[in-house]
Swiss-Prot record:
Topology term for the membrane: Peripheral membrane protein
Coiled-coil regions listed: none
GO CC annotation, single: cytosol
PANTHER family named among the record's database cross-references: VACUOLAR PROTEIN SORTING-ASSOCIATED PROTEIN 35B, VACUOLAR SORTING PROTEIN 35
Protein's cellular compartments: Cytoplasm; Endosome membrane; Prevacuolar compartment membrane; Golgi apparatus, trans-Golgi network membrane
One Pfam match: Vps35
Swiss-Prot/TrEMBL GO biological process terms: protein transport; retrograde transport, endosome to Golgi
Keyword Disulfide bond set for record: no
InterPro entries (UniProt xref): ARM-type_fold, Vps35, Vps35_C
Protein name, entry field: Vacuolar protein sorting-associated protein 35B
Primary gene name: VPS35B
Entry comment describing in which tissues the protein is expressed: Expressed in siliques and maturing seeds (at protein level).
Its biological purpose: Plays a role in vesicular protein sorting. Component of the membrane-associated retromer complex which is essential in endosome-to-Golgi retrograde transport. Also involved in the efficient sorting of seed storage proteins globulin 12S and albumin 2S. The VPS29-VPS26-VPS35 subcomplex may be involved in recycling of specific cargos from endosome to the plasma membrane.
Organism (species): Arabidopsis thaliana (Mouse-ear cress)
Family: Belongs to the VPS35 family.
Length: 790
C-alpha cells in the first residue's frame, strides 16, 4: 500500500529510485561490455527491483519506469546475440526464471520472451500465453499495470496476425486476439482496483491518478483494432462480446466511460453498424453515473459520418434498422437513468435527430418521431428553466430548418409546434426569428392557408403582445427588428390562385389583429399591400369572379377597410391615412368609384379628427392632393367635392408658407396631363392667384415681425408653376402673367436688399436662365416666350 506523503517526499523517493537504477545500470553495462551473463542478470535484476516501490504516485512511477525501460532495450540487444552470452535462447528463457523477486523476474522474462519469439524456436502463441499467464504473479495495481504495458509493447510486432513473420500452421490470428484480450482483461482489473488503494479520504486524488493511467489499458483496444485478419465475423463473435463483458462487469464509472469511448473510436464504422444492437445493449447496462449521452452521441456522430462518406452504404442502415435501434436505446437510457438532467436528454435527442437528418433525410416520420419523444420528455418537467437545456431544444428545432432548404417541409412536422410550446417567451422569439431567417435565406414561398396557419402558430411569440411587465423591458431596437422580420415574412406569402391567396390574407389578418398597439403599425402595412397586390392581380384577370366564396376586389376592399380602421384606434392616424389613399388608388384602377370615394372620405375624416400636428397636416394634405390628382375614376360631382375639400384644408394650414405651397399644389387637381385628364385652366389660375395672395401676406408678416420681407422663395416657386402650366398649354396663363410675376420678385428683392443688386436668389436665377435658354432655342415654345422681357 502506497503511503501518503507530500510532493517533496515523493520527489526524494523518485530521486533515490533513479539513483538506484543508474547505479545498477552502470555495473550492468560493464558486465554487458565483458559479455558476463551472470553479472548482467544480477545487476539487471537489482536495477529492476527499484520498480518494486509502492511510495510513488502513477506519474512519478512512470518516470522511474521509463528510466528502466531505456536500459531494458539495451538488455534485449544483448540477449539477441547468442555469441555474446553463449546460451541458446531456450536455456536463457529458463535461466531468467530463477531471479529472486517476481517483478524483476517478469521484466527479464518478457525481455527474453520477445527474443525467444523472434528466434521462431517455439510457436509465438505458446510463448505469449506463457508470459500473459505468469504476469498474474504481480497483483499490485500500479506495478502490474506497467509490467503488462511492457509486455504489450515488446510483443506488439510479434503477434501472429495475417501477413506477419510469425503467422503459420501453429499460430493463427485468433491466438493474437486471445493474447491481447487476456492482457486487456487483466490490465483493466488492475486499473479498476487502484481506487481501493489507500484511505477513502483521498478518493478524488486517486481518481485523478487513475485517469492518468487510462491510456495503458486503452492501448490494448487500439492494438485489437489494428490486427490484420480481424474480420467482421470474428469481431462480432469474439472481440466485441469479450470486451463488452469486461466493460459491463467492472462496474466502474471511469473505466466504463473510457472503454466505451475507446471501442467507438478504434474499431471500424462498418463493424459498429453491424453490431449496433450489441453495442447499444451494453450502453443501457452501464452504471447510472456514467455519462452515457456522450458515448451515444459519439457513436451516432461516427455512424452519421460513415453514412455521409458514400451513398452506397445507406442501404446497410436500412437493413440493420439503425434508427429504430438507436431510438429504443436512447429511450431506455433516459427512462432508466432517473437522475439524468433534462439537458442530457435533450442532447441525446439532438444527436439522434442529427443522425436521422443525415442518414434518412427523406423519412419525415423519423424526424417527427424524435420530436414527439422530446415532447413526452419535456411534458414530464413542470417548467423548462435550465438555460443549457433550452439551448439544446433550440438546436433540436433548428436542425430541420438547416437541413431542408424548403421551410414548408418543416411545417409538415406535427410535433414541431408542440416542442416550441415548451420554450419560454424569450427563447420562443429567438426560435421564431430563426424560422423567419430560414425562410428569407432560402427564398421560400408559403403558398397555402393551412401552412400559413402552422407557420404563424410557430412564430406567435413575435406576433402577440407580451405581458405588460415584459413589454416594458423589451429593447426597442430588438422589438423593431422582430416586427420588421414579421413584415418581411408577410411579403413571402403568395399564391397564384386568388381564392387561396384571399384565405392566406384572412389567416394572417386573424393572427395580426391580436398583436396589440405596438405591433400593428409594423405588421398591418405589409398585409394591406399584399391585399392590394391581389386586387391588382384580379383586375388584370378581368375583375370580379362569380361565386359567393370567390375572391373579388369588393370583398378584399371590405377586409382592407376593417383592417386599416384598427390602426386609427392604436392610434396611428398618419399611417392609416397613407394606407387609405393606397386603397383608394387601387379601387380607382378597378373602376370602383364608390369604394374609392369611401376611402377618400375615411382619409379626410382622419385628417379632420385625428391629425393635429401642423407638420403632419402638411404631409397629409400633400399626400391627399397627390393621390387625388392621379385618380381619374370620379365623376364631376364627386371630384368637385373632394377637390373643394382639399383646397379648403390647404388654405387653412397653420403657417402661411405651408398654406401657399398646399394651395399651388392643388392647381394640379384641375389640370391632369393625360389625354383624358381634366383641363380646367381657369381654376388653375384661380389657385395660383390665391397662392400668390397668401405668399404676399406671408412677406408682409415677415416684414412686420422681422423688419425685412425675407427670401422670395415662395414667389419663385409660384413662378415655376406658372411656367409649367404655360408650357402645358393652359390658355389662361399668359406671358404677361409671367412678366408681372418676374417684376414683382425683382421689386421684392430690391426692396429687401436696399440696393439695385438683383438675381441674388439662386432659385430665381436658375428660373430666369431657363426662360432665356428656351427663348434662344427658338421653335414654337421659344416663340411663346418671346413677349417676356428679362
Amino acid at each position: 500500500m502506497r503511503t501518503l506523503a507530500g510532493v517533496e517526499d515523493e520527489d526524494k523517493w523518485l530521486a533515490e529510485g533513479i539513483a538506484g537504477i543508474q547505479h545498477n545500470a552502470f555495473f550492468m553495462h560493464r558486465a554487458l561490455d565483458a559479455n558476463n551473463l551472470r553479472e548482467v542478470l544480477k545487476y539487471s535484476a537489482l536495477m529492476l527491483s527499484e520498480l518494486r516501490t509502492s511510495k510513488l504516485s502513477p506519474q512519478k512511477y512512470y518516470d522511474l519506469y521509463m528510466r528502466a525501460f531505456d536500459q531494458l532495450r539495451q538488455l534485449e540487444i544483448f540477449f539477441k546475440d547468442e555469441s555474446r552470452h553463449g546460451l541458446p535462447v531456450v536455456d536463457l528463457y529458463e535461466l531468467v526464471q530463477h531471479a529472486g523477486n517476481i517483478l524483476p523476474r517478469m521484466y527479464l522474462l518478457c525481455t527474453v520472451g520477445s527474443v525467444y519469439i523472434k528466434s521462431k524456436q517455439a510457436p509465438s502463441k505458446d510463448v505469449l500465453k506463457d508470459l500473459v499467464e505468469m504476469c498474474r504473479g504481480v497483483q499490485h495495481p500500479i506495478r502490474g499495470l506497467f509490467l503488462r504495458s511492457y509486455l504489450a509493447q515488446v510483443s506488439r510486432d510479434k503477434l501472429p496476425e495475417i501477413g506477419s513473420d510469425y503467422e503459420g500452421d501453429a499460430n493463427t490470428v485468433m491466438d493474437a486476439v486471445e493474447f491481447v484480450l487476456q492482457n486487456f482483461t487483466e490490465m483493466n482489473k488492475l486499473w479498476v482496483r487502484i481506487q481501493h488503494q489507500g484511505p477513502g479520504t483521498v478518493r478524488e486524488k486517486q481518481e485523478k491518478e487513475r485517469n492518468e493511467l487510462r491510456d495503458l489499458v486503452g492501448k490494448n483496444l487500439h492494438v485489437l483494432g489494428q490486427i490484420e485478419g480481424v474480420d467482421l465475423e470474428m469481431y462480432k463473435e469474439t472481440v466485441l462480446p469479450r470486451v463488452l463483458e469486461q466493460v459491463v462487469n467492472c462496474k466502474d464509472k471511469l473505466a466504463q466511460y473510457y472503454l466505451m469511448e475507446c471501442i467507438i473510436q478504434v474499431f471500424p464504422d462498418e463493424y459498429h453498424l453491424q453490431t449496433l444492437e450489441t453495442l447499444l445493449a451494453a450502453c443501457t447496462q452501464l452504471m447510472p453515473t456514467v455519462d452515457t449521452k456522450i458515448v451515444l452521441t459519439q457513436l451516432m456522430d461516427r455512424l452519421s459520418n460513415y453514412a455521409a462518406s458514400s451513398p452506397d452504404v445507406l442501404h446497410e442502415f436500412l437493413q440493420v434498422e439503425a434508427f429504430a435501434k438507436l431510438s429504443n436505446a436512447i429511450g431506455k437510457v433516459i427512462d432508466t437513468q432517473l437522475e439524468m438532467p433534462i439537458v442530457g436528454a435533450m442532447t441525446l435527442f439532438v444527436s439522434l435527430l442529427t443522425f436521422t437528418l443525415r442518414v434518412h433525410p427523406d423519412r419525415l416520420d423519423y424526424v417527427d418521431q424524435v420530436l414527439g419523444a422530446c415532447v413526452v420528455k419535456l411534458s414530464s418537467v413542470p417548467k423548462l428553466e435550465d438555460a443549457r437545456a433550452m439551448k439544446q431544444v433550440v438546436a433540436l428545432l433548428s436542425a430541420p430548418l438547416e437541413k431542408y432548404s424548403d421551410i414548408v417541409t418543416a411545417l409538415t412536422l406535427s410535433n414541431y409546434p408542440r416542442v416550441m410550446d415548451h420554450l419560454d417567451d424569450g427563447t420562443n422569439k429567438v426560435m421564431a426569428m430563426l424560422i423567419i431567417q430560414s425562410i428569407m435565406k432560402t427564398d421560400s414561398c408559403i403558398s397555402t392557408a393551412d401552412k400559413v396557419e402552422v407557420l404563424f402558430e410557430l412564430i406567435k411569440g413575435l406576433i402577440k403582445d407580451l405581458d405588460e411587465t415584459n413589454a416594458e423591458e423589451l429593447d426597442e431596437e430588438d422589438f423593431q427588428e422582430e416586427q420588421n422580420s414579421v413584415a418581411r415574412l408577410i411579403h413571402m406569402l403568395d399564391n397564384e390562385e386568388p381564392e387561396e391567396m384571399l384565405k392566406i390574407i384572412c389567416v394572417v389578418r386573424r393572427h395580426l389583429m391580436t398583436g396589440g398597439p405596438r405591433r400593428l403599425p409594423f405588421t398591418v402595412p405589409p398585409l394591406v399591400f399584399s391585399a392590394v397586390r391581389l386586387v391588382r392581380q384580379l383586375e388584370s384577370q378581368g375583375g370580379d369572379i362569380a361565386g359567393e366564396d370567390s375572391a373579388t376586389p369588393r370583398k378584399i376592399f371590405q377586409i382592407l377597410n376593417q383592417t386599416i380602421e384598427v390602426l386609427t384606434s392604436v392610434p396611428c392616424p398618419e399611417l392609416a391615412l397613407r394606407l387609405y389613399l393606397q386603397c383608394a388608388e387601387a379601387a380607382s384602377d378597378c373602376d370602383l368609384e364608390p369604394v374609392a370615394y369611401e376611402f377618400f372620405t375615411q382619409a379626410f375624416m382622419l385628417y379632420e379628427e385625428e391629425i393635429a400636428d401642423s407638420k403632419a397636416q402638411v404631409t397629409a394634405i400633400h399626400l391627399i392632393v397627390g393621390t387625388l390628382q392621379r385618380i381619374n375614376v370620379f365623376g364631376v360631382e364627386n371630384r368637385d367635392t373632394l377637390t373643394h375639400k382639399a383646397t379648403g384644408y390647404s388654405a387653412r394650414l397653420l403657417k402661411k408658407p405651408d398654406q401657399c405651397r398646399a394651395v399651388y399644389a392643388c392647381s394640379h387637381l384641375f389640370w391632369v396631363d393625360d389625354p383624358d385628364g381634366i383641363k380646367d385652366g381657369e381654376r388653375v389660375l384661380l389657385c395660383l392667384r390665391r397662392a400668390l395672395r397668401i405668399a404676399n401676406a406671408a412677406q408682409q408678416m415677415a416684414s412686420a415681425t422681422r423688419g425685412s420681407s425675407g427670401p422670395v422663395t415662395l414667389f419663385v416657386e409660384i413662378l415655376n408653376k406658372y411656367i409649367y402650366f404655360f408650357e402645358k398649354g393652359n390658355p389662361h396663363i399668359t406671358p404677361s402673367d409671367i412678366q408681372s410675376l418676374i417684376e414683382l420678385i425683382n421689386n421684392e428683392m430690391q426692396s429687401d436688399n436696399g440696393n439695385t443688386t438683383i438675381h441674388s436668389d439662386p432659385f430665381f436665377t436658375s428660373t430666369l436662365r431657363y426662360i432665356k435658354f428656351i427663348k434662344q432655342k427658338g421653335g414654337l415654345m421659344g416663340e411663346k416666350y418671346d413677349p417676356i422681357k428679362l
